[in-house]
Amino acid sequence: KNLPQTDVGGPWAIDAQITRGSYLIEMGHMTENNVDEWIAAAKSIGARQIDVHCGKTLRFGDLEPNLKAYPSGFDGVKRAVNKLHAAGLAVGLHTYAFYLAKESKWVSPVPDPRLGKHKMFTLANDLDDKDATVRVKESTKGMSTITGFLIANSVTIQIDNELIIFSEIETNAPYAFTKCTRGALGTKPAVHAKGTNVSQLRELFGLFNPDGDSTLFDEVARRTAEVYNDCGFDMIYLDAIDGAGALMGNHTPGYYQAKFIFELNKHLKKPALMEMSSFDSHFWFARSRMGAWDVPSKSYKMFINNHYIDNLTYAKSFLPRNIGWWAIWDWTPKDRMRMFPDD
């Protein structure tokens, strides 16, 4: 009885009209002032939906609008969505699931104690508000300062209400985090007493995440539902949900993925056309479409062939399948093969 109930997902997805047709992903360039241009672009390629990719115009996690794009905040977002609806287009909210921007309200200016923690330490001595070296009692052996979009590692530690970014690590006793930036990410440098907890935050995709077993995890899901409801969105794409392994809580990644999806669906006022960047049998009841792959950067024709073969397998899911995503690459980057007219 606790399974998500939606007439555009699971057993009803294949008959729902909204699950058909192409969608245009806007990567943070649409504003309240240029919506007409996006409507024209969508119409020119026969797209029936515009997917608003969060990150630039809506902040990951708390989904607060960028005031440069929407000076009047959510009122401007609602006007943009209404204009797209008037043009006959559905509108998608493309989030990074439970991941949180480093500027979000749960991180800055006061970091939430429910943020996901990786390694835990104890201050070895009193720390004033200017010290650039944080000494800890426990070993730091095996820790790294290497971070990146696909690297599950963070150089940010939390002590009380302060975040500190370290540049180097002393892995031999006395153990320490060195060359530190105090009061990082808009927090306030402070004095901390010997014996205080020092927590390395969890990070992936350049974003923090909540403790998967905390109330913050559910709070992020409810916030996503709130913005979806208030702004009148029609679709939700839960990108980055495949990064649930970085939560490393008391359960498997699939548990946290399903937990987030179930909590989100409980608070939606209208059914959402829903996709996500991972799949498990527990998601099927809420999922509306299958087959979205990230854009290829080379071997475009082989990509289509492989995608088609994979979609044959997903025919057993009884969900509509697509063969996106696509991007038209220019000739600037050095790390991708050029796109030619027959691509």
Where are these regions (language model features)?
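Glycine-rich, aromatic-flanked loop segments that form ligand/cofactor-binding clefts
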Residues: 2-13, 43-52, 76-119, 151, ...
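Glycan-recognition surfaces
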Residues: 102, 106-122, 202-219, 265-343
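Long, internal scaffold/assembly segments composed of regular secondary structure
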Residues: 256-261
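Aromatic-lined carbohydrate-binding/catalytic grooves of carbohydrate-active enzymes
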Residues: 17-120, 202-221, 225, 229-254
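Autoprocessing Asn-cyclization modules and mimics
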Residues: 97, 101-182, 186-189
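Surface-exposed interaction regions enriched in Ser/Thr/Asp/Glu
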Residues: 162, 189-202
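Beta-strand-rich recognition/accessory modules
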Residues: 1-19, 28-36, 40, 334-343
